[in-house]
Amino acid sequence: MRVLTTVLCSALLALPAAAWAQAAAATPAPPTEAAPPTNGGVDVGAQFTSVDGDEARYQRYRDLRNGVLVDGFHITHRKDAWTFNATATHVGYRDQKYTGEITKAGKLTVRFSWDQIPLFYSAADSDQFGLLSATPYTVESPGVSRLPDSLQSAVQATPSLLNSAISSAAQGVEIRQLRKTADFAVVYHATTSTDLLFHLVNTMKSGEQPWAATFGFSNAIELPGPLDHRTTDITGQVQWSNERGTIRAGYDGSFFSNNVPTLVWDNPLRVQDGATGVGPSQGRMPLSPDNSTNGVSATTAWKLGKQTRVFGNLSFSKWSQDSALVPYTINTLLPVFPLERQTADVSADVTGVYAGLNSRPNDRSWLTVRYKLYDYDNKTPEFPVTDFVNYDTSVAAFAHGGTDALSYKRQYFDADYSYNIAPFTALKAGYGVESDKRTFRQFESTKDQTFRMSLDTTGATWLMLRAQYNYSKRTGNGLDEEVFDAEDEGSALPRQFDIADRNRNRVAIIATVNPREQFSMNFSGGYVKDEYVNSAFGLQNQDGRFFSVGADYSPQAHVDVFADYGYEKYGTLQKSRQANPGTQEFDTTRDWTTDGSDHAHTFTAGVSLKRLKEKVDADWMLEYSNAADSYTYGLAPNQTIYVPPAALKQLPGFSQDRTTSSLNVMYYISRRVGLGAGWLYETFNSDDWAWTQETLNALSLPISGSHQIVLTRYAYRPYTGNTGFLKVRYLF
């Protein structure tokens, strides 16, 4: 009320002066103050973090360590036609980012950025469960992980000692990786109609990640797997354009190199290689190989008259990989089989086509037609295999006789016609068909046809609405019965859900209501149902439903309040048959099902104050999510799988929730200086039936008896984290 009174009094006092000014001769307005050639700002302060529980999961993709904070730096400098911009965030931390741009108006733009994204898997710090992450392995050299020989000798002699031996040898280990991306781009306007473009992206990954290194199902190993690789992407293009359209052509290359091509790790159960059926003293596996892609492409968009525009893209690329192949086994006591060739000799030709047309036949209708082609033609020669070594333990015959080169061709045609049935209201009908051809799959080809209808309106000033219904039907052709064995599989019917026959119904609605200028509401909802009509086993059906509702209120120009709630629920039904070869394969009383159900609630609310009374910026946001799932097993009414007293045991449900709250306040004590503070709170909890003190804390499972699973203790553990920020902002 006091502010309103002051404004009214000021307006009344100004009236006589305003009247005099109207009567007097107009005087020229004073010149406006020119923008300074250099301006910017920076935040300097500190951040403080406290975590109870899993520190790694709290930090995850960010770095919230205690320390000095230099954040939000930005600077702009202008001179004549040149402009320079630069930014820096979270300087010196693992998630730091820097950007820079130099522009000469109408002639040149040069951009550069350096972006780091950490991924923190698990920490070695102690919590209420003990060490969060530990391993008995030590890194001898990149890609080589070793156990103490004494541990292997003791366990080989007495396998029941594995748990105690692993626990005594284990040391805490941090498992984390860091992705660093350098991005450089240049746009040079050579002439009024011709541009030259260059783009270089260099992405490096280093560190570790949880890695499964197994000797088979009975001897599974988890250890920190090495990461040290680089991807370089290069693009060079020339673009010509005029008032009717544009044409662009260029080269694209992508090159991947891995500094750790193989992983070798010790077997905790043996210190010496064993003959057939005994097992090796170590294992070896190839990691991601060096590879490259080289391609050319052309893109165009062109006007045909006043009402029609055509556009398209054509690309050809060559994928290749020729790294050295790993021998069949590292076990020195097993036979050595010569490789058909010493390098991979892998290559593929990839063709991409995208073409379309937008047209407006009259003022009330629109027509859009699109076509896409993706052709992956695998040129890799066959690799004959007669015998191979199974898990470095024994020699086995390879019945298939060699490798199969996977190829596929995907074509997509789509057309939409829209008609304005009323002012600012359109009814749209569309049809799309996707045709896929694949090699060495249960179906040689599939066709997925989609029919859709939608209604869009902005006819009322207070309402925006879209409602859409889709029906799609996928069918397979050319069933390859050679991939089935009737005696072993029971029936030659497809059960791979990505190619099996499927009918889908989907409806969705999105609406925004603005009853007042300061207040708006939004709503979205939908339902989808998939039915796999010819799948005797595997996925039978799945459905999903979702809706969200939200509101935004701005009582004043500097104040905004919002809240949103969302709900999602998904279900699946899968079917199988527990059967041994023989008559059981056709016994329907041995059928069983898994009914899966997942649902999630999310709630978000916040308040934003911008330059309230020219002094205060403040933002507060709360996010809460809760998710739960369950799996219910079902049997046939006359089931014969369980013979009393044996009975089916259901799994308990699983749930988890996360709450995040953030508050940031900045108070400006002058036009250039502000004092700020912030607080981040996050908590995560989980109720998982697979979690017990044994599974959470053990480095090998089970704790008693013969142990053949070695872990790093990487798991989804609960945590509560708090981070505070103090900073001084200086603007210049």
Regions found by a protein language model. Name each.
Residues 23-34, 48-102, 106-732:
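Gram-negative and organellar
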